[in-house]
Amino acid sequence: MWRFKKDRSLESSIAYMCGALVITAGVGACLLRGLFFTEEMYPFLTLWFVLCCTCSLYYLVGVGAWRKSGGGAVSGITGVNGVSEGSEGSEVSGENKALRILLSVPLIILSLYVIHWLRGPLSSQGTMNEMLRWGLYASFALLVCFCAVNRVGRRIVNVTWSMAGMFLSMSALLAVCGVVKLPFAVAYSNSSEVSATGVRLAGLMEYPNAFGAVMAVFLLERLFAVAVYYGEPKKSVNMLGARSVGLGMECAEAERRSKGAGGVEAEQGKAGSTTAALLRLLPLFPYTAALLLSESRGAWLTAACACAAVLLWKRQLIAPLLAAGAAPVAAAALLYRQLARAGLAVEPVPGLLLLAGLWAGALLAGLWLCRRQRSAAGTARAAMLALAAAGWTAAGIAVLLHVRERITGPSSTVSARGLFYRDAWRLAAEAPWLGRGGETWRHAYLAAQSRPYVGSQVHNGYLDILLNLGFVGLAAILLMLLATGWLLATKSPRLLPPFMVIVLHSVVDFDWSYGLFWLLLFWLPALALAEDKQKHQSAPTHPQSETKLPIQSTSTNPLTNVSTQANPLIAQSTSTNPLTNVTTPTNPLIAYPTPKKSPQIRLRQLIGTTVCCFSLLLGVLSFHAAQGEKFYRQAIMSVDPSVKVELLQQSLGWNPRSPRTVIALSRLLSGEQSVSLLRQSLLYSPENASLSWELAERWMSSDHPGAALYWIDQSFRLDKYNNAKWVKAIEGMLLMGQKKLAEGNRKEGLVCVASGNELLLEYRRLAEEEANKGGQHNDREFQMTEQADDLSRRLSMLALRF
């Protein structure tokens, strides 16, 4: 008994640490704008990897201490082994394989980026950023899945999911009401193709499309959770409460407290049941309102497709889903019409009153509809469903009439993305198997673009992976998505709609540039594991039958590939019970110490040590990047040139891979020092258009026209639709020619003038070609400028004189 308690204490401590890390990731994703800007993530990543290293050290030291003291196996809640009663060995094996793929692919992606980083990528800085990101994703996936199969961690996973969704939605809605100050929570546009009202809700993510997709994920998770709950028979309260994760954990507790035997207990039970039901419906209205106010057509469409696909499979959920969503959707549509008419800018008091009134109405009406749908029969139930369908229809008409022009009219954004995709495919063909490293499109789109558009994001997550890691990386991602979908379909089909939103919406937007989407993607299977575990723990057991029929099956640990004994009927300890003679299952996400140091144990120790060392390495790397970013920001704010130089040099000392730091410092140094610094930076970013142009400018200010022309050509090869560069290059060659002629060097002077004329002719040719294609997609306004015409006259006059 003493050993058992100590083992449970060790596992609980690890579960609390992992849960704290899951909370940290959720908070960081919400506060750091969805983890989009890597530069502002560096301090968070440093803290994250230090905590991961500490957690792994604690685990290794704790398990080692118990092994030396002869302690028993660390008991824990069974995970993917033996969670289903009467499950066949093939099902368990398939589940383990899916979980193993889910946890292994992020490590494979991380390894591919490490390989690129070592062999010289297109951008060393971009590849380092992706390494840090995937280190975060891989560790988060492992931690959240471990928490999901532990009783303590399971509650943390569920509650943190719900709190993250509520925080994102409520912060955006309160910003609209003027209660919370978020500078970029509302996006403005004068184009009717971008917004029907000129304003769209972007929330903490500061991008309406991504924000809408996130809200669709949270909305469908909760909507289908409520539909599953009210779609089952009224009995089995405990099991149904367990199936509703997130706020459903509190609902299950409230319903367990609601069991009473008349009198005061019966009244308290009724109140507890109502409270649980209200908690279950609570997030639907803010999620729906935020989704509608984002005015994201892609999020709306993917949410509708995901719902339709799952409802075709689970048709018994249609009626409860109609009842659960009718009131929140209708109230959210009314709020959308009111706030859109006001330009998403209302006074705090009227806005809060409107928000609170509609929310309360949606809660009460939704509760009534759900209960009537569950208890009524015959004509009454048909009337109730007709009323719910009318609510959905009215809400849809109200919203669609408001945005019909955006939906039915031509869309420049759709054609622009088609242009992005064509250019991206051509770029991907240059390195089809392994890609060109991290952030390839961001650093190469200027060279790859066939029109002068502005788009540092390719607006397709799969193409982005293809550009970075080639078909090898894309195949790994697709395999992980298939494994995740299979795991959700077998463990919790109601989680398929939010998963499908992530998978589908990333086809048309750059969702995967936000770290939050990857966290949600790994969070969903953890929720499925947690729900499945809670469901089977809540199921009734029969001790006598367990004693007579000690069912045992051999299963495989998905992380260590160690065979363990699994009993699907008992989930208490891995030790043998002397009274029942039944061997109980093991936790697949924790290594179990044994007195003998077997090869498997040594392998697990090696893996744990590797994880610890790799976390430490990534932590050091992110700390260096954070220090470099800190000194760079200080240098930008400084007005003293000498202080600027000192701070920029310190920044480069911490992170020599940053091109913008090199460019800023090179402009403050002398000619030779500047050229040397820029050449050195090209080793980290060999095809950086800005670095090539800086070198061209340095050589144009010297007496080396040949070197100047070389770097001008390099710069235009990497960025040809740049008016300012063409004008400066032509002017630079003109000034060099004038200087050479004034010095009496007629030959070199005429060569410079002729080179300027050639540049001018090429510039005019490109500008005429672009003008013939029309103004659409000419976001950079590439055209012949008045300054270029003036330079043409000056070159002609100089050529006539000599």
List the model feature ranges, each with a label:
Residues 2-15, 235-239, 274, 330-336, ...:
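A juxtamembrane structural motif centered on a specific transmembrane helix
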Residues 2-11, 66-98, 230-279, 374-381, ...:
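Membrane-interfacial, low-structure loops and terminal tails that flank and connect transmembrane helices
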Residues 2-33, 47-59, 110-117, 129-143, ...:
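Alpha-helical transmembrane segments of multi-pass inner-membrane proteins
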Residues 47, 51, 183-192, 411-431:
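Extracytoplasmic loop-helix module adjacent to an early transmembrane segment
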Residues 57-71, 95-98, 114-126, 176, ...:
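Transmembrane alpha-helix boundary signature
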Residues 207, 418-456, 462-465, 469-476:
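TM-adjacent membrane-interface loops and short helices in multi-pass inner/ER membrane proteins
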Residues 397-416, 605-642:
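Hydrophobic alpha-helical transmembrane segments in integral membrane proteins
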Residues 631-802:
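C-terminal luminal/periplasmic domains and tails of membrane-associated envelope-modifying transferases
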